[in-house]
Curated annotation (Swiss-Prot):
Substrate binds at residues 300-306. This is Adenylosuccinate synthetase. The lineage of its organism: Bacteria, Pseudomonadati, Pseudomonadota, Acidithiobacillia, Acidithiobacillales. Pfam families: Adenylsucc_synt. It catalyses: IMP + L-aspartate + GTP = N(6)-(1,2-dicarboxyethyl)-AMP + GDP + phosphate + 2 H(+). The active site is at residues 14, 42. Pathway: Purine metabolism; AMP biosynthesis via de novo pathway; AMP from IMP: step 1/2.
Amino acid sequence: MNQNVVIIGTQWGDEGKGKIVDWLTERCQAVVRFQGGHNAGHTLVIGARKTILHLIPSGILRADVSCFIGNGVVLDPLALFSELDELRPVVPDAQERLFISDACPLILPYHKSLDRAREQAMGAAKIGTTGRGIGPAYEDKVRRRALRVADLFHRERFAAKLAEALDYHNFVLQHYFKREPENFHAILEQYLELADGLAPMVVDVSVRLARLQAEGARILFEGAQGTLLDVDHGTYPFVTSSNTVAGGASAGSGVGPADLGYVLGITKAYTTRVGAGPFPTELFDETGVFLAERGAEVGATTGRARRCGWFDAVALRAACRVNGVTGLCITKLDVLDGLAEIRVAVGYRVNGVVQEELPGGAEALAACEPIYESFPGWSESTAGVRHWADLPQAARCYLEAIAERAERPLAIISTGPDRDDTILRTEIL
């Protein structure tokens, strides 16, 4: 069995990764977030209780599991403490089991102001950002202008770096976007006060994870967003600002690639997307409405309605390739219950020419017309089914067809939001 597993979304995010992380964590000792920030939205349902996590790893709901926020994550301390406060009635020891890399870049107030100002200025061409400062924080990291968690514990160093960064960003806010500048002293005092609360959680995540591995612990790497939102491999420029693919797990945690283990690709039984960007299989008819309503397709972070469409096997195959996916997990199968016909995009037609590979970039994808293969639906309910043999024959055929198109084995099927509404086809851990 594999010692570690990487959980990756293979679509545009919202694939149901949080539930699967929570379910698999029963067999793990640590969970690691390695990219993104509090723009993620992982919804977990346990019994009658629903918990939505944005920054803290989903393994926090399992007792005795250590949770890590790796160096690849951009950290908003205010959002972190807010989430911890919300968790406290349910997970009173969350702060004691959470560890944060000292190398995490900080999201500061000017990042949020810039994010919102930039999005508003783009008008109809806007990307659909969450407005939480994620993109500007990553820009500062690449520009080597970022303030990191470690800087919080050195007042003079933090103040000097803040002054330099703020001088630049306030100029942009005032003279380009015509916005009010951010206040240096207010930011300095507010964030230095947060340092005491952060201090017990700050560690060298790479070293801690290496020690856990040496002790035989199983580590789960929790991806946020999805492959098609990857800054390099996604539908650029309608992407997030980090590497959401499996390779990001190594760079964003300090664990070597050879130690990542099994790569589990999570995909919905249909396709959704939040925000702008091309979406070849998007539905604008009553079936699209059916999927949105039955699937409760509203973003956990933004509250925006998700766009819905048929399953795209071309995109899945590309995601499996760039992630090195070992096995597939298909979620929300129960949403398709009752449809007479289900379609899967198996290729694209571009200017009359058939192609079977996902094109790079948004412009090329926008020109693609999907070529569909049809499958019979099923009238029986799959909600809550926990054994493969209990699924309708048509549902099994549909799932097997997806796996065949992806050239990957079926590992897990999710048939509902509860952690136990799950079918295991292949042992992972």
